[in-house]
């Protein structure tokens, strides 16, 4: 009886408790030329499973997207794929895993992925991956969300991007504190450990609460009056836009 209790205790101890329920992974619809990229996608999926974290991703079954989603699904965790209807024939090959949410366009895809997730991780990818990554970084800087953003820098893949960001800081286009929005690591285990400990240190442009309040109060159709002649001024005290 004591041996059985010890085994049960050991099994419980192996379960890693995470602060995240779901993590969004951005990655390519291609495998890349190096096997190390594919290995990293599978390893990331297994690391999410080990921490009882569900996956939110771009919904494709090809490339790194297919590998990470299959690894999470095989491990028994829930998978949510968000994909525009137009991209389904291109990015879905064979059976999909988990739940697939079809949306109308790329804007809705990114918004839904962000809404469903507690953190973001970027694997190697192309233009689409970069766009998704940079948008959630920009949202963090603006104060729209306070979720961690992680960069899985497999084999130094993102070193040129990091050099560009450092150059932008040096030239005064990005605040030094905003450089730390990006959490960086070469392996999935190390990256998720860093994300678990992440706390925003950068100065936000606007508070998250302000964004949420504006979103709730903003009318669906808001027309700014535009007379034929005149110029717009901003009346700061009232927060209204006027033309004179």
From Swiss-Prot:
One GO MF term attached to the UniProt entry: cytokinin riboside 5'-monophosphate phosphoribohydrolase activity
Catalytic activity: N(6)-(dimethylallyl)adenosine 5'-phosphate + H2O = N(6)-dimethylallyladenine + D-ribose 5-phosphate; 9-ribosyl-trans-zeatin 5'-phosphate + H2O = trans-zeatin + D-ribose 5-phosphate
Binding positions for substrate per the UniProt entry: 91, 109-110, 126-132
Organism: Oryza sativa subsp. japonica (Rice)
Protein name, UniProt field: Probable cytokinin riboside 5'-monophosphate phosphoribohydrolase LOGL2
EC code(s) of this entry: 3.2.2.n1
Cited InterPro entries: LOG (IPR005269), LOG_fam (IPR031100)
Enzyme class: hydrolase
Underlying gene: LOGL2
Similarity comment: family membership: Belongs to the LOG family.
Purpose of the protein: Cytokinin-activating enzyme working in the direct activation pathway. Phosphoribohydrolase that converts inactive cytokinin nucleotides to the biologically active free-base forms.
Key words of the record: Cytokinin biosynthesis, Hydrolase
GO cellular component: cytosol; nucleus
GO terms for biological process, alphabetical: cytokinin biosynthetic process
């Amino acid at each position: 009886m004591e041996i059985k209790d010890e085994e049960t205790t050991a099994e419980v101890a192996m379960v890693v408790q995470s602060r995240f329920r779901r993590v969004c992974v951005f990655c390519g619809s291609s495998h890349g030329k190096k096997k190390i990229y594919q290995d990293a996608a599978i390893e990331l999926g297994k690391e999410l499973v080990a921490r009882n974290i569900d996956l939110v991703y771009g919904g494709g079954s090809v490339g790194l997207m297919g590998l990470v989603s299959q690894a999470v699904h095989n491990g028994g965790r829930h998978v949510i794929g968000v994909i525009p209807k137009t991209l389904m024939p291109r990015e879905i090959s064979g059976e999909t895993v988990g739940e697939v949410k079809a949306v109308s366009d790329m804007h809705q895809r990114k918004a839904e992925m962000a809404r469903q997730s507690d953190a973001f991780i970027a694997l190697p990818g192309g233009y689409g991956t970069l766009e998704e990554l940079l948008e959630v970084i920009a949202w963090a800087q603006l104060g729209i969300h306070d979720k961690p953003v992680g960069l899985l820098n497999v084999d130094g893949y993102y070193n040129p991007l990091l050099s560009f960001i450092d150059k932008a800081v040096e030239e005064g286009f990005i605040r030094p504190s905003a450089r730390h929005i990006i959490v960086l690591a070469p392996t999935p285990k190390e990256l998720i450990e860093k994300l678990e400990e992440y706390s925003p240190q950068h100065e936000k442009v606007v508070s998250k609460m302000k964004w949420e309040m504006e979103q709730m109060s903003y009318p669906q159709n808001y027309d700014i009056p535009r007379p034929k002649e005149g110029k717009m001024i901003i009346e700061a005290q009232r927060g209204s836009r006027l033309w004179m």
